[in-house]
């Protein structure tokens, strides 16, 4: 989101996601009957700020290099410093246990690919594997990213463009409402799962 659409400072979202922007107290302007415009930097900053104040921890310069797989369930992530991985240094990673893991890695859907490849399991898709995103269709992509947001394997949830890639739905255009709605949906799914 920080980079907007092709690095423009303004981003667009549709009416269906406006309630999320209001919840985060982000400034916006009406563009037409269904589209709204907001500042990309303010929007991203507000989301990060509110997430941290709600209890989220953001790890700086970390990369997830694997998942923890116990009893046929994704149970956490294996992390290392990004510069260590980039330089190819042999440094043992750390494990972070988690009740739920979200693959929000975008088009690459790295966590889902890793889980399927390394553990011989079937994801909750038509093929049992990462299908791969289809070519761009703005309207369908915005709807399908939300539909594809789900628990894709026990303990592993998928959202955003990773959901599109895993489920084989079209990539989205420069509209951000579907991404926000996908994030809200995965948060609600996990809240329900942890009750």
Where in the sequence are the language-model features?
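Residues forming the flavin
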Residues: 1-19, 24-195
